[in-house]
UniProtKB/Swiss-Prot annotation:
Cofactor: how and how many bound: Binds 1 Fe(2+) ion per subunit.
Protein name per its UniProtKB record: tRNA N6-adenosine threonylcarbamoyltransferase
Major enzyme class: transferase
EC annotation from Swiss-Prot or TrEMBL: 2.3.1.234
Annotated GO MF terms: iron ion binding; N(6)-L-threonylcarbamoyladenine synthase activity
Gene Ontology process terms (BP): tRNA threonylcarbamoyladenosine modification
Claim: Transferase is one of the keywords in the record: yes
A Pfam family hit: TsaD
Residues the entry annotates as binding Fe cation: H111, H115, D300
Cofactor needs: Fe(2+)
Keyword terms, alphabetized: Acyltransferase, Cytoplasm, Iron, Metal-binding, Transferase, tRNA processing
Length: 337
């Protein structure tokens, strides 16, 4: 059984084909980073137009990579939300149209469920139950996961997501878009302890996050200490350490409250090597395990949508004839399978 996955929720066009027996057969990705770089962030209209240009050619490339024809596809999965409405509509319209033309089911997929299940693509996938840390440019959430669709929100950011805070602080440091990965690279040259940033909301009970204050703290620190190269690196180090420590503290609390021994980290920020190392160290001390996808499957991609689509397809989920997307879509609303 083979599922074609289409991801167009933001600024990456991702197409993949997943086979339930052979695994991932094809994975095509086009990033719009250069398109949006001059604007310092994603421009929704430009993103939508570029998805229109790239989606069908990438589908053709994926079929060629897998050595398949359209008649070999058993279902088409597409990201139906959350995300940018225009971008979502491109993928949903193409996916629904292909499914109709090929006479196969169309499977709407939740973008964050795709991220959550991305570690399942690895050779050592996690077993249920586990705590999931979904951490990206648009989301920072802690989820109790006891099965597919059995998701309980434990905590989330009340303002900026962690990835958003990375990008905004990187901009303050004069780094180009997308700044998060560049900030992490700069932090490697920083001196630990020269600056100490707060660990927001760790001094009170609960599992919610708040990262907007760190951006303000960074701006004030830059203003007070100048902008020479080493100072900028030291500030980047202090900022990253604060975010990583905050995420680690909240993950530890979530594991303690649930009693689970497994932690899954997913989303674009899960590619951060400092975060991976800190969480791995924490889980080793707790005699637990941490799981995450390979770096190319941490950011938006079609493989996670194809896999999540396969899981939902086997459970009997299909789309109605119309094209519907949900720019805002709580993960907890998904049905269990």
């Amino acid at each position: 059984m083979r599922v074609l996955g289409i991801e167009t929720s933001c600024d990456e066009t991702g197409i993949a084909i997943y086979d339930d027996e052979r695994g991932l057969l094809a994975n095509q990705l086009y990033s719009q980073v250069k398109l949006h770089a001059d604007y310092g962030g994603v421009v929704p209209e430009l993103a939508s137009r570029d998805h229109v240009r790239k989606t069908v050619p990438l589908i053709q490339a994926a079929l060629k990579e897998a050595g398949l024809m359209a008649s070999d596809i058993d279902a088409v999965a597409y990201t139906a939300g959350p995300g940018l409405v225009g971008a979502l509509l491109v993928g949903a319209t193409v996916g629904r149209s292909l499914a109709f033309a090929w006479n196969v089911p169309a499977i709407p997929v939740h973008h964050m469920e795709g991220h959550l299940l991305a570690p399942m693509l690895e050779d050592n996938p996690p077993d249920f139950p586990f705590v999931a840390l979904l951490v990206s440019g648009g989301h920072t959430q802690l989820i109790s996961v006891t099965g597919i669709g059995q998701y309980e929100l434990l905590g989330e950011s009340i303002d900026d997501a962690a990835g958003e805070a990375f990008d905004k602080t990187a901009k303050l440091l004069g780094l180009d878009y997308p700044g998060g990965p560049m900030l992490s690279k700069m932090a490697l040259q920083g001196t630990a302890g020269r600056f100490v940033f707060p660990r927001p909301m760790t001094d009170r009970p609960g599992l919610d996050f708040s990262f907007s204050g760190l951006k303000t703290f960074a701006a004030n620190t830059i203003r007070s200490n100048g902008e020479d190269e080493q100072t900028r690196a030291d500030i980047a180090r202090a900022f990253e350490d604060a975010v990583v420590d905050t995420l680690m503290i909240k993950c530890k609390r979530a594991l303690e409250s649930t009693g689970f021994k497994r932690l899954v980290m997913a989303g674009g920020v899960s590619a951060n090597q400092t975060l991976r190392a800190k969480l791995a160290e924490m889980m080793q001390k707790r005699c637990g395990e941490v799981f995450y996808a390979r770096p190319e499957f941490c950011t938006d991609n079609g493989a996670m949508i194809a896999y999540a689509g396969m899981v939902r397809f086997k459970a009997g989920v299909t789309a109605d004839l119309g094209v519907t997307v949900r720019p805002r879509w709580p993960l907890a609303e998904l049905p269990a399978v």
